[in-house]
């Protein structure tokens, strides 16, 4: 969960004489910065961003794939919180495992805080039987965090007569940045058409504090637990002969933040519909997530919208998320069956 920023409305508030809103706005911004340091960006389309959810999904698709994800959180406040993700992975027959690459860019408070996370992943696949296999993965990479003061606005910089922003910062501020290594581990397993796994991100709990004395810069270990299944119903009276229902559960914990997500997917031929409920156990708001997806042999598209169920709905207007997956090459028989049956989104 991220706290929203009012800084886009600051100019109008000062023109109306609401100087007190600045103190609240600046407090919210500082709290948001602390939250960013303590928690990773989140995506609602968990399985449309599988390597982000769990690195052990690397190389578990039938074909090499490239996935692009975009999330605009709380769009009514402008493009205040935006996250972009790119991942590429493939199965390698010679190693009986998968290799992958992931690059994530997260922009907070319209560019005041920026984070880039890049990593390489290797996943080893183990074929236990015709009905059961599992994967274990190690992810190594870096995190780059930047603090950009050019996005900050203070009341002394705003002309209360015409709202023009000018002047200098009333307190000394310096831009800063930090680059540190990062490591994660994950494992997934599949038995028939049920799947489950766990992931541990930020094993070393890296210190992202940009300034000396900042005690809130430590990035806590993130635990992810997930499970799901697919059931098939064959019929002759709808679009295709096969209708799929897939219930899923995802639990995540990072520091004091705890969240549980439960949802179900309905798939009919090229169409996928999904509905999830998100419950933030340690903080609010909760939300309802509606999803729509299209799928063909070489392309998948997903769109989702988070409906906030809390008092912040009037200010945030939910969150938009888009995913696109591209598959490459031709299918070749593998050394063993290790394609995951996870949902499209």
Predicted region positions:
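Subset of outer-membrane beta-barrel
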Residues: 39-345
